[in-house]
Amino acid sequence: MGTCVVRGRWRAVGGAVFRVLAVWAVSTLTMLILAGLLPDFRIQSPSGDSPTTIARTAAIGAGAFGLLSALVWPLLVRALLLVPAFFLGVLVFFLNGSMLLLALRLVPDGGSEAGPETAVAVAAIMSAVASATSTALAVRDDGAYRRRLRRLAHRHRPGPRRTGEDGLPARPGILFLQLDGVGFDVLSEAVSPRTLPGTGRVLPPVMETVASWIESGGHRLSMWRTDWSSQTGASQLGILHGTNHDVPAFRWYEKETGRVLVCSSPSSVAELQRRAVERTGDRGLLAEDGASRGNLFSGGAQQLALVLSVAARRGRGIRSRAGYFAYFSDPANATRTALSFTAEVFREIVQAVRARMRGDEPRVKRGGLYPFIRAFATVVSRDVVVAAVIGDLFAGRTVVYADLVAYDEVAHHSGPHSRDAQQVLARLDRSVRLIAKAAAHAPRAYRIVLLSDHGQSPGRTFAEAYGITLEELVRIGCRGGRSGSRPLAGRRADREVTGAEARAVARAALHRVDEEEKETRRGRGAGPVVLGSGNLGLISFPELPGRVSREEIERRHPALLGTLAEHPGIGFVLVRSEEYGPVVLGPHGGEHRLDQRVVIGPDPLAPFGPEAEDAVRRTAAFPHAADIMVNSAYDPTTGRVHAFEAQIGSHGGLGGSQGHAFLLRPAELSPPVPEGEILTGAEAVHRVFRRWLAETEAPGAPLSPPAGGPGERVG
């Protein structure tokens, strides 16, 4: 047996040496070809050299570049943790080119030279070729492939291991992978075969890997219903920390402090997490050997990467950005992501121009910084989170929760069912496949749970559909009142042009952690504060303490509530009555008294389904519910709503697919709810996940799901 072990080690060493030599040879050949093609790149003296000398120079230069990439690059990236990560993609090219120039100076002949711009291009090409060669060689060897994935993730020190009699972990781990904003309807379409219009040709599903899991019976798909505030802040806080009490919207005004809390501000989400932990007395879902990757909240995990709630604290903020180092310390990864980032920027510009030329409707502006925000969400954030998750799998962590925000960002501006969004889903499917392959090589079995935090509902913006913003509508309603005050903040909400989750990650990467909160901070006595959270609007009167009653609003602004409730773009209005408690007002004099369960006239909540009553009643009891809460109109036949932000795919309120998230669980886990029932509320999802974690205590759990689609060989 000892002889077999020795032979195996020598075989591994021999294979590693062969791969190093092969990559070196390919890099040398690449340098020779580029020297022949690029006029500003020379690896011979001006007087000319023999072919042997040129080849030797190329080999030395390629070898020096490879050594510098392996030894110096990780140190540079660690230093760059002090630099805003958003600029890392630009610095990648400059630093890579600088290392190539240094490598050429190390060549003894001294005849090699390259212009700065040429050095950047040559370094990028050589890094990409070396990475592709190394990957191609490693794919043929399971051991090498496993080591390749480990290097991809640059895993940290492994967490605690629990071993059984056979030396393997006695309990499987669980990976919760959140596909941000992918509604139940969107996922159902993405895992179904498609028919090419006009030809009848059947195409494979957009998400082939996920479809294969369902088709094989290894996973079961179900829907879960969100709270009224159908957005990541409320959903993820409830899922990770067990409560989303007093989170009425994506952004809301708190009178006692004069602040607007926003679920994309690090200081705001840190405060929400503190309140949740204080309320539950529990650190969170991930407290036991867990990892939180790309999320708004930590979930109590000690292993963090791109977690917004710790970004406001500089000391831990640097630590939370260690995920950047874990990925970008490989120069090939850095180059590939930087190139993909650039390509994604141009892809968005081209897609936006095409949409305008086709006259697509509805449509929102997609200029300014948006192409860069989209590229950050669909490339940088995705790559870093996926690498961190793979590192967690190889570290054998007990539970991992990660969020991929790419789809949500694109769907906001291109539409939930657009071709642009489908392309993002296909790329997310490839990320899921890569993670599943890594799980197959991990030191413990893993159960992979896919879920979303909400869906998205399509529709023209409120401003586009009716030629007026919510802020302007409130102003009209206030004109007949005694105060004659003018709202402050509604225009800002209507001008919002970027997806909240992606913008939050990008802001943290730029170290602009509190800019949005500073912009939305308002003093007392300045008139109503009007905010938009998707198709949910909030109106607060800062000069009046506590929750202002319906009767007081009607005394001060007699026309306001009627103006809002009777507008065709408004579905219903929630206020608090001194006599009846929470009351929902709607068109044609409709009124729904929630505490008494009494409806007068047409029920304003009827178009939103039977579950709307409980959802609105729960939010009405929140201490920081706005004085007036407004939900846009909803068309049940088309599923369309009207966002109070510049988004044609929106979420945050009631109406349509935005409130229908999905849950895809391994068949071995117990059903989330009894058959015929629908899981409702993020807090209920937390309880289900707790139960599933308890179920994994039993030994002998099945292995992770297969990584590929039908017919794909795994392992």
Explain the meaning of each model-derived region.
Residues 141-160:
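Short, highly charged, low-complexity non-transmembrane loops/tails of multi-pass membrane proteins
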